[in-house]
């Protein structure tokens, strides 16, 4: 699940956090929110939260392992997410909605059927977290979502900094 790269005539698919995987995560969120549409910025934040749901008190275990300084992931997801949305849009699984306040993305009537045939452990966990995410944050305002991110982004992944300090003290 990731970006396809040509390498000396061969095709290589980067398995993690490429357009295919990030687009699939966005599709799961949009499907759970259907028929509501979300902005790209909201989807960037939601992608972070679905991957690192354990950063939210009371959230389910994260879809991916925790990494140091993971809060910075928010800065690099936008472009890849756009590519993923375009990929799924080209298959009529996501649609762009143009409104007075901007461009939004929504699932289509085909999205649920597509997701239903994907039965891997990863997709099952993804869909569970998408339901939790939309249920917990789907209706909060963009301003409140942005405030939550600003208030906590410095904490997300910071536990590794403390862990490395403690480990350094033990070895001395």
Where on the chain are the PLM-derived regions?
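Generic structural signal for hydrophobic core residues of well-folded globular domains
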Residues: 30-33, 49-50, 88, 118, ...
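C-terminal regulatory/oligomerization modules of transcriptional regulators
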Residues: 152-172
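Non-catalytic interaction/clamp surfaces of large macromolecular machines
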Residues: 143-147
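Short, amphipathic alpha-helical interface elements at domain boundaries
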Residues: 2-72
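Short amphipathic alpha-helical interaction segments
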Residues: 74-90
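Minor-groove-contacting beta-hairpin "wing" of winged helix-turn-helix DNA-binding domains
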Residues: 101-108
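A short, conserved structural fragment
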Residues: 89-99
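Short, amphipathic alpha-helical interaction segments positioned at domain boundaries
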Residues: 110-142, 156-163
């Amino acid at each position: 699940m990731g970006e396809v790269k040509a390498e000396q005539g061969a095709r290589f698919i980067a398995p993690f956090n490429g357009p295919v995987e990030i687009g699939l995560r966005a599709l799961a969120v949009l499907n759970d929110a259907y028929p509501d549409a979300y902005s790209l910025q909201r989807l960037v934040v939601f992608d972070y939260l679905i991957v690192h749901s354990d950063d939210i008190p009371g959230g389910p275990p994260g879809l991916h392992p925790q990494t140091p300084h993971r809060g910075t992931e928010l800065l690099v997801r936008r472009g890849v997410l756009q590519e993923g949305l375009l990929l799924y849009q080209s298959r009529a699984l996501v649609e762009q909605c143009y409104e007075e306040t901007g461009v939004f993305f929504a699932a289509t009537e085909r999205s649920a059927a597509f997701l239903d045939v994907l039965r891997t452990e990863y997709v099952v966990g993804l869909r569970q977290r998408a339901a939790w995410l939309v249920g917990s944050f789907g209706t909060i305002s963009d301003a409140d979502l942005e405030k939550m991110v600003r208030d906590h982004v410095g904490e997300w992944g910071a536990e590794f900094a403390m862990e490395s300090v403690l480990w350094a003290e033990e070895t001395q």
